[in-house]
Amino acid sequence: MKMMKVMMLIVMMMMVMVMVSEGSIIEPTCKETPDFNLCVSLLNSDPRGSSADTSGLALILIDKIKGLATKTLNEINGLYKKRPELKRALDECSRRYKTILNADVPEAIEAISKGVPKFGEDGVIDAGVEASVCQGGFNGSSPLTSLTKSMQKISNVTRAIFYSNSIVKEEACGSSWPSLALNIDSKACVVSLQNIQFNRGRTCW
């Protein structure tokens, strides 16, 4: 009985040591992105960040993109009253940011939830593109410059993490993504990808 208690204590200590040794992966992950400081700041601002894996970090950043897009749309709606002469440019920006919310963000979330981050990169990249197009619709200065630049930066950071996550998945599951349809089961990958449909009508392959 005493030996059993000792064994249980040892197991518990080993589990704690593993948790401590692993720690947060925020900093090493952010080193793979184009803006380390922004990446760390965004991820540390969310309580989920300290215990999240790479997929979890990607989801946090997708939430940041969603939040910023929502904030920008609210700003656009306010500008219709303050700057009516900018209506055409604001209409374009409104369409672009609605695309981010209604297409890009859901696409990226679905890719993560299905365990195929590689196929979420397009949505993340497109969020930055939509912001750039919005900015380009203004002749000269834009009241949305700060927000559009922030979206571009967050998009670039998120894309890097999606790419990093894709590499991890490929190393765990095999480099040939179509082979995952065979229900490969490994220590880091238990997935079934048959007939996965993404929200723009795409399939995995």
Curated annotation (Swiss-Prot):
This is Cell wall / vacuolar inhibitor of fructosidase 1. Inhibits fructosidases from vacuoles (vacuolar invertase VI). Residues 1-23 form the signal peptide. Its main location: other. Glycans are attached at N139, N156. One of its GO terms (biological process) is negative regulation of catalytic activity. GO terms for cellular component: vacuole. Keywords: Disulfide bond, Glycoprotein, Signal, Vacuole. The lineage of its organism: Eukaryota, Viridiplantae, Streptophyta, Embryophyta, Tracheophyta. It comes from Arabidopsis thaliana. Belongs to the PMEI family.
